[in-house]
Amino acid sequence: MISLINNQDSKINITTATQRLARAIMLSQGQFSLLLACCNSTNKQQQLLSLLNEFLPLAITELSIPASAETLYTTITSALGSTQPEALMVQGLESVVAINQLIVSTNLMRDELSKRFEFPLVLWVNDEILRKLVWLAPDLKDWAAATIRFD
């Protein structure tokens, strides 16, 4: 009985968090906004993206960042070219080999992000990446809207 209740609570929390993320994306249409979505399971992230598509009436562009990436800005601009998607979801940060360098360079380039991107940028992070953001790039972390947790 307890596991059923916990499971139901978990589903409610996930749905609520997904709705919060969808609302944040909708409110940021046509302008840059950095959103952090924290989920420790990559499989769960995929399920959440499917659920998110049910809440959003717009096309979400997904970008899986390669493990060899050294800068987030260059990786995104190379992938998008001159395209300005309605929203961009970046996944795979947990697999980046030089994650510390990527986080520091993103912090240094944060003003360029807002100048170049006219869409909400959602970074999917896990607890470890979130801790690194706090320690290595507190300005970037503070610049982002509140972290939306999917636990």
Question: Which functions belong to the PLM regions below?
Answer:
Residues 80-102, 116, 120-127:
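Conserved P-loop NTPase "ATPase switch" module shared by AAA+ and STAND
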Residues 1-86:
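Extended, compositionally biased accessory segments flanking or bridging domains
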Residues 47-55, 106, 132-140:
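Short, aromatic/basic amphipathic alpha-helical patches
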